[in-house]
């Protein structure tokens, strides 16, 4: 079995310390990733973790591209607590478009501090030390699972005669702009709300989230709200001049613009018929993973 050792930090403030855990941490706690000794590199897609049961998502890459395995086993523990023990979890691989993909799992971070995650995969036969450092607050900065989010007046197709005024999508699905977030939270239907800017999706963990949302919508007969909220309020103005970008009011109301690295990433929320958030996804979420979340709110 191969082993990736990934160190993540969950902390309230920047630590003034040097931590030497299995010889892999130094005093540069805000670095995100380090290549392993054989070129395999983990890339953490969920960089905004906080105390509680959280979805983590990560990519594994090598010189040939994405490392793919059906599942990997995770051993997670708090490394500063003497009574901490390994929590064993399984991360499942989900295909993304364009030959990419990521592993996801739910992990219970019961207190802030440094956490160690060892990743085992059965198609390798060597120890591959690597690490990821994570930086977050104790509490979630944005609408969390179990909460009712802001009732934002997001833009709809009726607000403009040109769809390019409300989305940067190249081939927009106009049905994703039928109703506002405010209306969706009050019409007693489950909702899937994606905040994304398709034209400015450039990071390794970004993907065609709006396309995935549209595909998922077309696969359901059940009455659901599917909404895309463009990150920027003036899409047409910024195609040639990104300095002119204005953040959409809904993005500010949901506090997504307060997160590190927020500009290139998407956030997707699945809400029940009462308008309560049941699932929250940072970065790209595949249609299959999103489908599982939607099915859970339909059943309940």
What are these regions (language model features)?
Residues 15-18:
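C-terminal motif of bacterial Sec signal peptides marking the signal peptidase cleavage site
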Residues 23-114, 118-164:
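Contiguous segments within soluble domain cores/interaction surfaces
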Residues 80-81, 270-278:
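Short, glycine-anchored, charge-dense loop/turn motifs used at functional sites
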Residues 143, 155-161, 276-300:
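Thiol-/selenol-based redox modules, centered on thioredoxin-like
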Residues 162-167, 173, 181-202:
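Short active-site neighborhood of thiol/selenol oxidoreductases, capturing the structured segment around
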Residues 195, 221-240:
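Thiol-based oxidoreductase modules, predominantly thioredoxin-like and allied folds used
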Residues 203-220:
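Typically the conserved alpha-helix immediately C-terminal to a functionally engaged Cys/Sec
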Residues 231-265, 270-274, 296:
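Thioredoxin-like thiol-disulfide oxidoreductase module
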